[in-house]
Amino acid sequence: MGLGPIPATEKALRRAGLTIADIQLAEINEAFAVQALAVMQALGLSSDITNVNGGAIALGHPLGCSGARILTTLIHEMRRRAPTAPRPFYGLAALCVGVGQGEATIVEWLN
């Protein structure tokens, strides 16, 4: 349980024609600490760009709307960094869902 973001992210990256190296900011669901660390390790995500404002343990884990919280946090941080971010500027929002499922969305900042 909790590793669903790994294949979901890999699939989203393939569909977008990107690699994990193209991602400059990531918000990963932190259902529990070791789960987020396992996902980061498997995907090769740096702690410098992942959950930069804290994960669900710090910010809260709103059951039923975790995806909305993760995407909103990602977009707010992308907007904050946009003036100095290299282009193209890509962010990743990913979360685990019950019984091993996962979701991933790649956001491209256009400005």
Model-derived features: positions:
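Claisen-condensing/thiolase-fold acyl-transfer catalytic domains that form or cleave C-C bonds
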Residues: M1-N111
